[in-house]
Amino acid sequence: MQVFRSVLIRFCVALVAALAASGESIAQRVDALAFDEALRLGEERSQQLRAEDATALAAREMAAAAAEAPDPVLTAGINNLPVNGPDRYSLNDDFMTMRSVGLSRQLTRHDKRDARAERFEREAEAAEAGRTLALSDLQRETASAWLERYFRERVREVVAQQRDQASLQVEAADLAYRSGVGPQSDVFAARAAVAELDDRLAAAVRDEQVATTMLGRWIGSAAERPLAALPDIGTVPLHSASLEAQLANHPEIAVMLKQEAVARADIEIARSATRSDWTIEVMYSQRGPDFSNMMSLNVSKPIQWRESRRQDREVAARVATAERARAQREEETRAHFAEAMALLQSWQANRERLQRYTATLLPLTTERTAAATTAYRSRTGSLDAVLEARVGEIEAQVAHLELELETATLWAELNYLVPGGHEAGVTQ
């Protein structure tokens, strides 16, 4: 009866522990930070996107203001006031003294106002393109940070697992030594292997903490949550055969196109400045009670008598600036094409390497460790061979994870050349 009670108690304890572990696992899965959620959080927290929105709004407000005619100018004053003689400082005695009120306005041409408004509209479009570029950069950085943390966790788990296995090897070596069937040097060798793995585990934990911190730079405190499953990184939205056409939508190229449009709008402003505006002024002047009041009407217009040395040069300067913007855009397009092609080629080559790791390298290192362990247990092999095989196995596993991280980072670079590119992937 007592034995039955003891067994029942142990069963209940084990059941409670299993349920607790299961509950904790379920809670972690519910609270897991998915890849797409991280992208959404990064977009919600970004102040750069708000800054670009504000820039676009400011430019559109300026465009509306630039399309309006200038405000009239009100003038008031006293003209021809005597300062000496019997009538000094008198407003009424001298027939030339007048109190004047006037209104003037520059009659700015419609084409000038339209050119200025158009320029601000192009600035607003450039800001909108800048927002798309900022979103693309944000998604790429957030994706890379999420992937970095994911694989750093996997490295830490691999090292921790190897460390646990090495601890069992210490116990086995110590038992063999105490039983007189193994040398003491095997004990020290096993302990040294554990110490090396402890150091490696500390480095892996550090790398994981740094990766979590860098992810937090983009998504805040949510970076501390456990991560969900890895997204599908086997497809990218680009294809080498149509890469040049696809890069026409690259946000940075779009920004440069809009900046080029701003430069062309500056040309129109400079050309419109070669046509002078008229200014009209109406003034009413009141004299003393013994004299007649007066009214005057004036018009004025700037005389552009050295147009070839001033206005024409300003137009030429704006044309040269627009040509510079065009040349820079074309050069940047070529650079982006080469960079994207290099990224695509590297991603494809890495995927082939990963297949070799999975099909050949990792199974071989696992089999080598198993064979060395079997030989050691049957007293036909040495502990050094086991430890060497374990080192080779962990090196291969970590190298595989590092290659996976590099490949995933390349995937993020390719996927977010354009915002949301992962939504329409092409298997390469």
Question: Which ranges hold each PLM region?
Answer:
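Bacterial Sec-pathway N-terminal export signals of envelope proteins
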Residues: 23-85, 92, 106-107, 115, ...
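Residues that define the transmembrane beta-barrel architecture of outer-membrane proteins
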Residues: 95-99, 291-295
